[in-house]
Design a protein with these regions (language model features):
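Acceptor/aglycone-binding surface of glycosyltransferases and processive sugar-polymer synthases
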Residues: 79-81, 85-95, 102-105, 114-192, ...
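Structural signal for short hydrophobic segments within the conserved structured cores
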Residues: 75-77, 165, 204
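Hydrophobic helical membrane-anchoring modules
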Residues: 1-9, 193-270
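Structured catalytic core of nucleotide-sugar glycosyltransferases
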Residues: 1-142
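A generic fold-level signal
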Residues: 5-7, 44, 166, 174, ...
Length: 270
């Protein structure tokens, strides 16, 4: 069923939520990348573009079904409801792990440079890397607020003791070997970019420039960013727990002293 490291089966895993405007455009780019890599002899023709419909309310799933009928390289799965970006990525990875040699997860909006996949595959084939992180070399397309909050977020995570790759989101290559180890994680609050380094296999990074969104609007508002940040901090670091525990001990100690003081005052007053 599987190919070899020299001719691996690649599954490109793409989470989709209400992407009817951008999907008809980027789907062609993903297919072209697959066919180009096959033509160059870098991957097997059994490679696929795997779309994960995350409970979309628009025509996203209908478009995915039409794509699957149009070309064998397109396949899709659909979640029964919207479970969030991280869960959608994980669902795609788990769907692919027994069918491929490597996966590359990437968003549907076209902001991540698809051409970086060539270097990712090369790092797997030639250098034996099991994980390859896509790292943004520039964030010129982001607003000042987003750049500032992103930088602060990474600094906070590192200060909390979490191991994360700076300027890396969810654009990465993972081998099937890594995916099978990753399947053993039972984390409820998913923060994939922090969980992947914990697996511990040989890794490297590939730099790329981030583009403007090709079409449609972002489905990742500030509220979701804050929620992801909270999940990252609470799931990867014990420092918040230690802080809360220490604070609780101090409060309990002060309360105990207060009670003793009140008893003494009452006895002296009597």
């Amino acid at each position: 069923m599987k190919a070899t490291r020299e001719n691996p089966i690649l599954y490109i895993v793409i989470p989709c939520y209400n992407e009817q405007e951008v999907l008809p455009i980027t789907s062609k780019l993903f297919l072209k990348k697959i066919t180009d890599l096959v033509a160059a002899g870098k991957i097997s023709d059994d490679s696929r573009v795997l779309f994960v419909n995350d409970g979309s309310k628009d025509k996203t799933w209908s478009i995915i079904c039409d794509l699957a009928k149009s070309d064998k390289h397109y396949i899709g799965i659909s979640q029964s409801r919207n479970r969030g970006h991280q869960n959608a990525v994980l669902a795609g990875l788990m769907e692919a792990k027994d069918k491929c040699d490597i996966t590359i997860s990437i968003d549907c909006d076209g902001q991540d440079d698809i051409n970086a996949m060539d270097a990712m595959v090369d790092a797997y084939v030639n250098d034996g890397c099991e994980v390859v992180y896509g790292v943004r070399s520039k964030r010129d397309t982001d607003t000042f607020f987003k750049r500032f909050t992103a930088e602060s977020f990474y600094k906070l995570l590192n200060a909390m003791g979490a191991e994360v790759v700076y300027n890396h989101a969810d654009y990465r290559l993972m081998s099937a070997r890594v995916l099978h180890e990753f399947a053993n994680f039972k984390e409820v609050n998913l923060f994939l970019r922090g969980m992947v380094p914990l697996v511990g296999f040989k890794s490297t990074s590939v730099a790329y420039e981030r583009h403007e969104r090709i079409a449609g609007e972002s489905h990742y508002p500030l509220s979701k960013m804050l929620s992801l940040a909270f999940d990252g901090i609470t799931s990867l670091s014990v420092k918040p727990i230690r802080f809360i525990t220490g604070f609780g001990v101090i409060v309990a100690l002060i309360s105990f002293i207060g009670v003793i003081w009140a008893i003494v005052e009452a006895l002296l007053g009597a």
